[in-house]
Amino acid sequence: MAAQGFLLIASFLLILLVLAKPLGSGLARLIAAVPLPGVAGVERILWRTLGITDHEMNWRQYLLALLTLNLLGLGILFCLLFWQEWLPLNPQRLPGLSWDLALNTAVSFVTNTNWQAYSGESTLSYFSQMAGLTVQNFLSAATGIAVVFALIRAFTRQNVHTLGNAWQDLVRITLWILFPVALIIALFFIQQGVPQNLSAYQPITTLEGAKQLLPMGPVASQEAIKMLGTNGGGFFNANSSHPFENPTALTNLAQMLAIFLIPAALCFAFGEAAGDRRQGRALLWAMSFIFVVCVAVVMWAEVQGNPHLLAAGADSSVNMEGKETRFGVLASSLFAVVTTAASCGAVNAMHDSFTALGGMVPMWLMQIGEVVFGGVGSGLYGMLLFVLLAVFIAGLMIGRTPEYLGKKIDVREMKMTALAILVTPMLVLLGSALAMMTDAGRSAMLNPGPHGFSEVLYAVSSAANNNGSAFAGLSANSPFWNCLLAFCMFVGRFGVIIPVMAIAGSLVSKKVQPASQGTLATHGALFIGLLIGTVLLVGALTFIPALALGPVAEHFSLP
């Protein structure tokens, strides 16, 4: 089993790196605002048609453009969901959503979280899925990538005040990166058996003679961008464990690769844009180390078997509860770590049925800020925040003003870094405390004791860090939970983006200082270790008390 797990991890990472490197070169061209080959003429026509100028924006203008797009999308999506019954492509005649569920869902998809307090096949029409959710899957992913583009330019430019044109970046990211790659993935899914139609649900008779209604819909197109954009919201309630979303072992592998593809490619793009590929590789090494350790822990925990079944004398050599037999324990464990290391949230197994330690690792990966590869764009700018913190700590130890890529890190940058890093932990801890203190929060818990608390902690961690996965033993479709999690999702997304853009605005105007003998090398093994230690230290200090009350207590209470 250990050899199989090692081979699975190694194969996955090898294929990922082979695919990510050329995509990273394309992303680096977009960061430098250089059109991809053959599209310059098309872009000129687009700019004239859409009224987009070549005028570059400072950080406030860039941020305002992104906020305007997202708030407009939030309002439109809310209206689509609320008045769904009056809109076309609704063959099942599904009613509109309640105001609180429509708000929660709109915020969820605009913030790239894709938390779902509903069952897709029994709640949403095809029009809502296509014109509402799928559109936001593209736009929310493009927003995250645009933010990291601006931050990378802040490190590579000097003595200027502009970070690029947000509208041009959004169009280029969507048309030249997200759409073509998603199209290729969607066609592969269709070939593997994922439905792509607008047919009404199909009544069938099973082999046992029972009547059943099979849901249909444009699944493949949404599934592709759901994974590529690290969105994670499933067309069906069972998400990627549903055979219509993830029918084969090949689609399972493709989905995991799609989740990590752009986050890994952005590391390569960062190195190319910075003029030193070692900088991008250092971040990739740090992310990969944490990722591999986490996968190993989850695989080990899940192959130990279910303690309750073992105590009852049952044959439980591995913990198969909540897992699909077509994937097995190892692939399900790998998928769980991939989807929570990135801010995807798609699942091919029930995380609530993992062992206590097996479920704790995905929860902790979310709590440290989704920086182990992370979401498209958000993972890299989240890790760069930890880079600035690590550089600052190193500067304190050696008595030098901290620098990164030749840019001095001053008080303003560190204040914004601290604010951005602390936003999500505050939301998680305060939100969980509020839920446990109120009757409305506790009434949603379907399990008592440490596991019930773990379900609450997981839900708020998932929302605040824009992941979207869940321990499903929580009845979250209530006004209290819909509003609480919508608030956590919105602040967790834009409460980090705003200080990140402020950091970019401050750094871009600074001069690049030449390296000296005392300059800390940020591409070697020493700095990689310091960066990993910084991530682990912040995660440990912040969440160990909460984790001790949940999964750790549950683990020690097992038979």
From Swiss-Prot:
<dbReference type="GO" id="GO:0005886">
    <property type="term" value="C:plasma membrane"/>
</dbReference>
<keyword id="KW-0812">Transmembrane</keyword>
<keyword id="KW-0813">Transport</keyword>
<feature type="transmembrane region" description="Helical">
    <location>
        <begin position="356"/>
        <end position="376"/>
    </location>
</feature>
<feature type="transmembrane region" description="Helical">
    <location>
        <begin position="132"/>
        <end position="152"/>
    </location>
</feature>
<feature type="transmembrane region" description="Helical">
    <location>
        <begin position="27"/>
        <end position="47"/>
    </location>
</feature>
<feature type="transmembrane region" description="Helical">
    <location>
        <begin position="253"/>
        <end position="273"/>
    </location>
</feature>
<protein>
    <recommendedName>
        <fullName>Potassium-transporting ATPase potassium-binding subunit</fullName>
    </recommendedName>
</protein>
<dbReference type="GO" id="GO:0030955">
    <property type="term" value="F:potassium ion binding"/>
</dbReference>
<keyword id="KW-0406">Ion transport</keyword>
<feature type="transmembrane region" description="Helical">
    <location>
        <begin position="524"/>
        <end position="544"/>
    </location>
</feature>
<dbReference type="GO" id="GO:0008556">
    <property type="term" value="F:P-type potassium transmembrane transporter activity"/>
</dbReference>
<keyword id="KW-0633">Potassium transport</keyword>
<feature type="transmembrane region" description="Helical">
    <location>
        <begin position="416"/>
        <end position="436"/>
    </location>
</feature>
<dbReference type="InterPro" id="IPR004623">
    <property type="entry name" value="KdpA"/>
</dbReference>
<keyword id="KW-1133">Transmembrane helix</keyword>
<comment type="subunit">
    <text>The system is composed of three essential subunits: KdpA, KdpB and KdpC.</text>
</comment>
<keyword id="KW-0472">Membrane</keyword>
<feature type="transmembrane region" description="Helical">
    <location>
        <begin position="283"/>
        <end position="303"/>
    </location>
</feature>
<keyword id="KW-1003">Cell membrane</keyword>
<feature type="transmembrane region" description="Helical">
    <location>
        <begin position="484"/>
        <end position="504"/>
    </location>
</feature>
<feature type="transmembrane region" description="Helical">
    <location>
        <begin position="5"/>
        <end position="25"/>
    </location>
</feature>
<comment type="similarity">
    <text>Belongs to the KdpA family.</text>
</comment>
<comment type="function">
    <text>Part of the high-affinity ATP-driven potassium transport (or Kdp) system, which catalyzes the hydrolysis of ATP coupled with the electrogenic transport of potassium into the cytoplasm. This subunit binds the periplasmic potassium ions and delivers the ions to the membrane domain of KdpB through an intramembrane tunnel.</text>
</comment>
<feature type="transmembrane region" description="Helical">
    <location>
        <begin position="379"/>
        <end position="399"/>
    </location>
</feature>
<feature type="transmembrane region" description="Helical">
    <location>
        <begin position="63"/>
        <end position="83"/>
    </location>
</feature>
<feature type="transmembrane region" description="Helical">
    <location>
        <begin position="170"/>
        <end position="190"/>
    </location>
</feature>
<feature type="transmembrane region" description="Helical">
    <location>
        <begin position="327"/>
        <end position="347"/>
    </location>
</feature>
<keyword id="KW-0997">Cell inner membrane</keyword>
<dbReference type="Pfam" id="PF03814">
    <property type="entry name" value="KdpA"/>
</dbReference>
<keyword id="KW-0630">Potassium</keyword>
